[in-house]
């Protein structure tokens, strides 16, 4: 498989996952599938306060919207970008994805430990899944250099 094809396949798989996440966030934010927020007790607690729930929904849809922008940019990079542009954009993805461990992972881990996430252990699964994507990006980048 040509080097740039490996990278394109990796990015395409990531975009499929992100598209599923966007659909879940927009169409079924309370779902427990993909990265919808139904796994969080706070989502369910917010439904008891209309103003708080409106704010939480706003934040969920804001996240979905930023993912749509991200997906759109990556589609342009895949469709019209040359191999070098795709490589450099993929290199930029590694630290961007890794920011999950800076702010989000400590929060979701604490919520998980405090029984605010169902199923228990969700934070570990999410952490390992993201680590897997990071590793896959690094391998695809290395194969493309």
Name every feature range the model reports, one short phrase each.
Residues 2-23:
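Hydrophobic transmembrane alpha-helical segments in integral membrane proteins
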Residues 10-13, 59-66, 89-95:
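Physicochemical signature of membrane-embedded alpha-helices that form the seven-helix bundle of GPCRs
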Residues 16-53:
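Hydrophobic transmembrane helix segments
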Residues 38-78:
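Core segments of alpha-helical transmembrane spans in multipass integral membrane proteins
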Residues 72-95:
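Juxtamembrane helix-break-helix junctions at the cytosolic face
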Residues 99-114:
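Transmembrane alpha-helical segments of integral membrane proteins
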Residues 118-131:
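Individual transmembrane alpha-helices with interfacial aromatic-anchor signatures
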Residues 136-145:
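Juxtamembrane boundary at the C-terminal end of a transmembrane helix
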